[in-house]
């Protein structure tokens, strides 16, 4: 048995070396061109007669998910991505719905092209020109939608949008950044770019109608729905009970390391008030759920017709979905039909913390709910639960208003006693998930006000003892649209306004106890402490030998641990990276701030100079 384990460890070490080569080898040039997808209707759509009428007015809609710029200003691009983007597939579904409903009646058809820049290919000025020329050649109209744009992707998305706009192409932008940061909306509108604020389901029909009439507006936001509280005020959010489910595209899935994995959101919103998080301010604190039967039917179809075996429920907190029990019960039936089906999800600490009745506790409805949830999740095929624990220090948790991770009694306790209670709570979370065979993935932030230079080392050491399987570490970042961003901006504590650096691995704030160097060292200490070489070997041996988890949980932990081990050492956060980087040296960032980008792309050099490679490199204007 010992020899077998040694041989197994050697195998995984060799595999790790190969993965290191894939992760760390830059390929200069030789970039595969992205295949512009003309998304065909799904089987259901074909059955309902959604085929393109001939001849008809055709609008080719590009949904583009921008990448971001790396440290040297090059666009991040990988041969394989790590996770399909849910926004792209959800938006494609809206076009299909329009075609099913209106194509024949209105003699209008929407062609859909989805382009995920991180794995489909870098969009160069030549690409933009070719897209317009191809549309003209095919006799179709062109509409560009920058989709699901996060703050660290905004500079890249803005640059692409402005280049399309310079050629006279109508452009829209949506996502968390524009939904949470009015200043960027104002800038885009000044440039003639439409901003779509909030969720698109209730807006898309009106957007297309306005476009077809030649009256595309500069600003769209949700007007019909329910009122939901945020961290600051109230917003209107749409009900999603009957919202369209994402379109599965087999071509898109081949761009990812695991092409049998996809994503879906079954609910939206988050009831909590964490000050660093933008979810509650964009989607509200009122939980809304899709119809469970529709979700289960979609998953079954994905398994049967697209070979899907792994699913990521991208709900911000699936445990708080009002329909989780019905969905999990349905997924249990899917698991019986497709034994290889499994999924991961994001939940809060209470999802498993009270699945056991600890000494001195009396069983309550909270315990029964937690126990029911963990048992159903495991039976339905859950292999990993992502839990945002964020800090071990109760003072930090209270600062961030993340009260769900603390114990009410700790307000009367000394700090060390309160900290011990927090750690004990996290230990219960992990133990209860492991008891039902589910692995755990923690999210942890470094740089709260009560953190010091040793916060990374202490975090790694403690999280190892608690027995979290995977940990994603993040540098505390003032994301636009959050209470933290408003607070730090008012205090003058934001030292870096380049949105490209809001990726949770750059220092962008002043800190009373940490300078930039010690903060980055704490970040490195956390990663190298948790993902050390001894721990890599230990994980290979103990996880492969069993250790209380399901087979898919063990495989997932092995894959992710090795991937995280090397990805961090290559200077890339695993959640925003990919496999096998490809470097396009001919495409490099020129503009930093919004005004500089406007002068460059709309008022200045235009494409001739850009294509000749002229520019001023990295300018230092404020964002």
Regions flagged by a language model, labelled:
Residues 94-110, 305-306, 376, 380-381, ...:
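A structural motif corresponding to the C-terminal end of an alpha-helix
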Residues 48, 59, 239-441, 446-448, ...:
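Radical SAM [4Fe-4S] cluster-binding motif and immediate context
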Residues 184-206, 371-384, 458-473:
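Structural recognition of alpha->loop->beta junctions
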Residues 63, 146, 173, 313-315, ...:
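Conserved beta-strand positions
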Residues 2-63, 104-107, 129-141, 163-166, ...:
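Radical SAM enzyme core and accessory elements
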């Amino acid at each position: 048995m010992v020899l077998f384990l040694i041989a197994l460890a050697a195998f995984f070490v060799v595999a790790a070396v190969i993965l290191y080569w894939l992760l760390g080898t830059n390929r200069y040039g030789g970039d595969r061109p992205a295949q512009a997808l003309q998304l065909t209707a799904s089987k259901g759509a074909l059955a309902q007669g959604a085929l393109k009428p001939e001849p008809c007015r055709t609008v080719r809609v590009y949904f583009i998910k921008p990448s971001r710029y790396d440290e040297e200003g090059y666009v991040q691009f990988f041969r394989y991505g790590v996770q399909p983007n849910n926004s792209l597939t959800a938006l494609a579904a809206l076009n299909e719905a329009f075609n099913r409903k209106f194509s024949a009646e209105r003699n209008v058809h929407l062609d859909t092209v989805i382009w995920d820049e991180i794995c489909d290919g870098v969009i160069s000025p030549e690409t933009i020109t070719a897209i317009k020329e191809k549309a003209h050649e095919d006799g179709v109209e062109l509409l560009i939608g920058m989709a699901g744009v996060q703050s660290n992707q905004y500079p890249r998305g803005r640059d692409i949008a402005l280049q399309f706009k310079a050629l006279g192409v109508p452009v829209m932008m949506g996502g968390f950044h524009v939904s949470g940061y009015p200043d960027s909306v104002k800038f885009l509108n000044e440039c003639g770019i439409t901003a779509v604020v909030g969720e698109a389901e209730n807006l898309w029909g009106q957007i297309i109608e306005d476009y077809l009439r030649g009256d595309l507006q500069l600003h769209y936001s949700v007007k019909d729905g329910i009122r939901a509280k945020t961290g600051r005020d109230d917003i209107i959010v749409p009900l999603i009970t009957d919202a369209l489910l994402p379109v599965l595209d087999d071509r898109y899935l081949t761009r990812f390391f695991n092409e049998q994995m996809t994503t879906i959101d079954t609910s939206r919103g988050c009831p909590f008030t964490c000050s660093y998080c933008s979810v509650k301010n964009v989607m509200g604190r009122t939980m809304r759920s899709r119809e469970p039967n529709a979700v289960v039917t979609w998953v079954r179809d994905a398994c049967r017709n697209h070979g899907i075996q792994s699913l990521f429920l991208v709900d911000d907190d699936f445990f708080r979905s009002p329909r989780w029990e019905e969905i999990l019960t349905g997924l249990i039936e899917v698991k019986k039909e497709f034994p290889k089906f499994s999924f991961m999800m994001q939940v809060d600490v209470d999802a498993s913390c009270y699945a056991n009745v600890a000494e001195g506790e009396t069983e309550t409805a909270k315990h029964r709910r937690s126990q029911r949830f963990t048992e159903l999740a495991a039976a339905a095929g859950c292999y990993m639960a992502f839990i945002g624990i964020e800090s071990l220090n109760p003072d930090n948790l209270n600062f961030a208003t993340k009260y769900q991770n603390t114990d009410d009694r700790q307000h009367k306790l000394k700090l060390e006693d309160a900290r011990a209670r927090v750690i004990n709570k996290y230990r219960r979370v992990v133990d209860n998930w492991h008891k039902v065979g589910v692995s755990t993935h923690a999210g942890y932030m470094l740089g709260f006000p009560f953190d010091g230079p040793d916060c990374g080392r202490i975090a790694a050491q403690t999280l190892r003892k608690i027995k979290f399987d995977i940990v994603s570490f993040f540098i505390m970042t003032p994301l636009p649209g959050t209470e933290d961003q408003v607070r730090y901006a008012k205090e003058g504590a934001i030292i870096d306004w380049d949105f490209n650096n809001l990726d949770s691995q750059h220092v962008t704030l002043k800190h009373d106890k940490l300078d930039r160097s010690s903060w980055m060292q704490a970040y490195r200490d956390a990663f190298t402490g948790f993902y050390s070489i001894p721990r890599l070997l230990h994980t290979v041996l103990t996880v492969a030998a069993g250790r209380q988890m399901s087979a898919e949980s063990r495989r997932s932990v092995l894959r992710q641990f090795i991937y995280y081990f090397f990805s961090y050492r290559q200077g890339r956060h695993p959640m925003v990276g990919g496999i096998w980087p490809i470097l396009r040296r001919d495409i490099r960032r020129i503009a930093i701030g919004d005004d500089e980008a406007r002068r460059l792309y709309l008022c200045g050099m235009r494409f001739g100079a850009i294509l000749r490679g002229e520019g001023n490199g990295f300018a230092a204007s404020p964002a």
